[in-house]
A protein has these predicted regions:
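Sequence-level preference for short, compositionally simple segments enriched
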Residues: 1-249
Length: 249
């Protein structure tokens, strides 16, 4: 509540307000942010104003410039801490709305969910009334996050959207460990190592490209959740390694 947060200088009930207090971390002393279970809207889904980007870029929910930022959910179940938005191309935004635009090396996210619920229902078992229906059923480009940096780690994180999901796309090198992802096409990070992950494919081509360095899947599970007769990985040509993984239809 506002009453509780007012007592403490570094306790917030809004992620966006907390972000104003972020200071640059280092590899030895990262900027650590602990997030209690709840649904935190990075962009107000009830605001009728259409989001428009600046300087020719897509519209962003929140731009975060903070090296060695560590976001940690205070739970072992990532469904209990949700960073959410609900906008996409022509659906509350002009351009491919992107919830986060992170800048800086050493970003780490753990034990939480990042979701753009423009075309997916948000379900929050801890407090059902915090759930929300999708904005529209017609699937459009609705991004989760861009990341401009190196040595990025996501552990026990759920990434939720459909078209162009973008789980921290743009990272030079990124490890996804024990993560869960839902998407259709043009969605996954082409420079990622996916270790012990679960991915649900609602489209035939989850990658747009992987030629920036190549993606690697290790001991991961792929669930094909569409009715097309074939499943691919990429629209474009690029390196891809799949080791000890399983397909489920």
């Amino acid at each position: 509540s506002d009453e509780v947060t007012a007592r403490y200088p570094f306790v917030f009930n809004s992620f966006n307000e907390a972000a104003k207090a972020f200071v640059a971390g280092t590899e030895a002393e990262p900027m650590k942010v602990y997030i209690a279970p709840y649904v935190y809207w990075i962009d107000n889904p009830d605001d009728p104003q259409v989001r428009v980007g600046k300087d020719g870029k897509e519209p962003f929910g929140l731009v975060v410039k903070c090296p060695y930022l560590h976001l940690v959910g205070l739970t072992k179940n990532p469904e209990n801490v949700v960073l959410a938005s609900s906008r996409g191309q022509t659906q509350g935004a002009v351009g491919n709305f992107t919830m986060f635009d992170f800048w800086g090396d050493g970003l780490s996210v753990k034990n939480l969910t990042m979701g753009n619920y423009c075309n997916v229902d948000l379900e929050f078992p801890l407090k059902i009334e915090l759930g929300r229906k999708k904005r529209m059923s017609a699937i459009t480009q609705a991004h989760v996050a861009y990341c401009h940096g190196d040595k990025i780690v996501a552990e026990n994180v759920r990434f939720i959207s459909r078209l162009n999901m973008n789980p921290l796309n743009g990272a030079k090198r990124i490890l996804f460990y024990k993560c869960y992802m839902e998407s259709t096409d043009d969605a996954l990070t082409g420079t990622g190592v996916y270790l012990n992950c679960t991915l649900k494919f609602y489209g035939q081509k989850p990658f747009w490209r992987t030629d920036m360095g190549g993606a690697v899947f290790l001991n991961s599970d792929f669930y094909v959740c569409h009715d097309e007769d074939r499943q691919y990985f990429c629209k474009g040509v690029g390196p891809l390694t799949v080791v000890d993984c399983r397909f489920h239809v």
